[in-house]
Amino acid sequence: MAIIHDIVSAKQQARKLLVLLVDPEKQDSLAAMGSLLCLPDMIFVGGSTGAYSQACLSQLRAHTDRPILLFPGNIAQFTPTADALLFLTLLNARTPEVLIIPHIQIAQQVLQSGIEVISMGYILIDGAHQSSVERATHCTPIPQSDSAMILSTAIAGQLMGKQLIYLEAGS
C-alpha cells in the first residue's frame, strides 16, 4: 500500500506528482533518456497493444530507482516484478470483454503475486482522432465538450471504489 499512500498523501498536501508513461513497444528510446528517468516521481509502463512489459521493466530498473507501476493494456502485460499494478477498468466501455473478463482471467495470478494493486478507473475522451485504445477496445470516447458526462463517469468510478481516475484523450 506504499505507492497509493504516497499518491494520496501528495494530493492531501496539494503537491503535484510527475508521472512518465512508457510504452513497452517504444522502449528502445529508454537508454537515450538516461538521467531523465530520475525526474518523474513514478513511471507507468504499458500500452494498448500486447507488447510484453518485462524487458521494458528490466531496462527501466537499470536507469532509475523510481517506483514502476504497470499500466497494462491487456493481461499479457502483467509481470509481478513491478512495484504496483494499476488495475484498470475502462469506465465508458460497454462490453464484458473490456469491462470484466480480463480482470477475471488475471485475478488469481495478481492476488498470488503479492504485488500492490491500485484500482484505477480509465475514461476515454475524444481526442479528435481515433486512438489506439479506441481501436483496441471498440469503446466510444466521451466528447471533450461533455464535461458533465466526464464528471459523472469519474464519480461513478469513485463510487465503485476506484482509488484513482485516469483521463485518456488519445495516443
Explain the meaning of each model-derived region.
Residues 46-47, 56, 97, 121, ...:
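Glycine-centered flexibility motif
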Residues 16-22, 41-45, 68-70, 85-87, ...:
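Hydrophobic faces of well-ordered beta-strands that scaffold small-molecule active sites
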Residues 77-154:
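Conserved anion-binding
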Residues 31-35, 70, 74-87:
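Catalytic cores of alpha/beta
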Residues 54-74, 106-118, 171:
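Alpha-helix-loop-beta-strand connector modules within alpha/beta enzyme cores
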Residues 130-135, 161-167:
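Short, structured loop/turn "capping" segments at alpha-beta junctions
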Residues 25, 47-50, 73-75, 90-91, ...:
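Short, ordered loop/turn segments at secondary-structure junctions
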